[in-house]
């Protein structure tokens, strides 16, 4: 690893304390320096210090009303201390009614990914995050996999040529949409100046964990799956309103919470809703273009945000429910949840149960990371990633090691932690994946 690694010095100290030479080599072949085995412990120490500092800063903010203190937190699955501490810090600010950590949860910017918080008459700009309206869409075709199996490499190459992946990309085709004619929405959100750039970016996918997947279900029908959000529009909106609210950008920082009826709150909600509509339009555009490449007709579609704030009623109370990397799952509501790259995905549906109520009718949005992006690149090789995909018959275009399937939990294990809150309707097995190429950093991903 480069010497710029922020955890190297402490990892070397821990290695020496254990009586091990930090520069000795471990593992097969040349292996890696022994201190790398202590990097995770050094990182956890650092995050714990950050969480404690954030808690001290929060304690000096405007005191939380007594009726919102110690709100219940429902935790699905097992999480590291840093993730839980980050969530508790978030819940110590504002009119918090309850919170949830889903089983795929992990540290995020200000609020954990997989974290859900219900507010009374308030909304968290930090909680919604920078990729406003990031979500998934899946569409089932009347085309069977067996009918296209011989031309899958050609189809996925055409997808990569037709759809724009990566950062700062404009669409090769002009994407028309009625959203761009809604002048009131652009004015009320104070995002009018971004409208033309948003036109050029509609339907661009970005990088990181954003993708276009081709999958087949139990009956052999083809599904198109996409995952991305509102691109530069959402990032610009979030940055602008986070600054206006006096919020900070970082992992362990107090969340920026605003009143729904304040001028700032009203404008932010308008901007969030605009970005949400934009994200929906972009995913629909990509699915339709991919459908045209494959052929066939859509017989079913499932579409959901997982970075957003919804106005909902829970236990008779009207609340803002902020989901950051969590899928809404009300009884009978369908959701598309992807696994890791090349892993099975599911179409699921919420059920009514005490556990589901406690979850604020929320479930996972993916498998959830085991290792951060830098750690994944250090641990895994391209050969290992390619072998994993080849064994499962997945054709891949693009992607980097930070998205290695080995860096993620397995989706069935994660869903098992939410038993009794959702049921799986379809299991979708991918056969082709298109993502941005190596080295693309995406500030707009979730």
Predicted regions and their residues:
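Amphipathic alpha-helical segments in structured regions that serve as interaction surfaces
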Residues: 2-55
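A generic, well-ordered mixed alpha/beta core segment in the N-terminal half of proteins
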Residues: 125-185
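Domain-length cofactor-binding catalytic modules of enzymes
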Residues: 56-85, 94-100, 109-113, 117, ...
């Amino acid at each position: 690893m480069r010497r710029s690694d922020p955890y190297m010095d402490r990892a070397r100290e821990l290695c020496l304390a254990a009586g091990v030479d930090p520069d000795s080599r471990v593992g097969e072949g040349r292996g890696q320096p022994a201190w790398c085995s202590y990097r995770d412990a050094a990182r956890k120490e650092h995050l714990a210090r950050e969480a404690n500092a954030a808690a001290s800063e929060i304690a000096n903010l405007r005191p939380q009303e007594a009726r919102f203190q110690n709100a219940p937190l429902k935790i699905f699955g097992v999480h590291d201390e840093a993730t839980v501490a980050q969530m508790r810090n978030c819940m110590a600010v504002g009119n918090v009614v309850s919170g949830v950590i889903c089983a795929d949860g992990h540290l995020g910017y200000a609020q954990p990914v997989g974290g859900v918080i219900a507010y009374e008459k308030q909304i968290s700009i930090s909680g919604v995050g920078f990729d406003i309206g990031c979500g998934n869409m899946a569409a089932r075709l009347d085309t069977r996999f067996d009918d296209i199996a011989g031309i899958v490499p050609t189809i996925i190459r055409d997808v990569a040529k037709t759809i724009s992946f990566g950062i700062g990309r404009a669409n090769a085709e002009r994407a028309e949409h009625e959203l761009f004619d809604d002048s009131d929405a652009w004015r009320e959100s104070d995002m009018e100046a971004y409208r033309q750039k948003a036109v050029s970016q509609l339907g661009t996918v970005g990088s990181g964990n954003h993708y276009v997947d081709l999958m087949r279900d139990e009956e052999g029908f083809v599904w198109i799956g996409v995952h991305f959000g509102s691109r530069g529009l959402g990032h610009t909106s979030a940055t602008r309103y986070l600054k206006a609210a006096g919020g900070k950008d970082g992992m362990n920082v107090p969340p920026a919470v605003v009143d729904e009826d304040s001028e700032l709150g009203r404008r932010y909600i308008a901007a969030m809703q605009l970005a949400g509509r934009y994200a929906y339009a972009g995913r629909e555009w990509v699915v339709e273009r991919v459908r045209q490449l494959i052929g066939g007709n859509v017989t079913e579609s499932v579409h959901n945000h997982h970075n957003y704030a919804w106005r909902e009623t829970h236990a008779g109370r009207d609340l803002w429910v902020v989901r950051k990397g969590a899928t809404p799952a009300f009884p009978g509501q369908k959701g598309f949840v992807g696994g890791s790259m090349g892993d099975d995905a599911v179409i699921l549906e919420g059920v009514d149960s005490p556990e589901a109520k406690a979850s604020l009718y929320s479930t996972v949005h993916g498998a959830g990371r085991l290792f951060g992006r830098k750690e994944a690149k250090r641990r895994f090789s391209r050969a290992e990633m390619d072998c994993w995909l080849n064994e499962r018959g997945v054709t891949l275009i693009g992607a980097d090691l930070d998205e290695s399937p080995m860096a993620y939990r397995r989706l069935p294990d994660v869903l098992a932690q939410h038993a009794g809150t959702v049921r799986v309707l379809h299991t979708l097995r991918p056969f082709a994946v298109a993502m941005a190429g190596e080295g693309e950093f995406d500030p707009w991903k979730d």
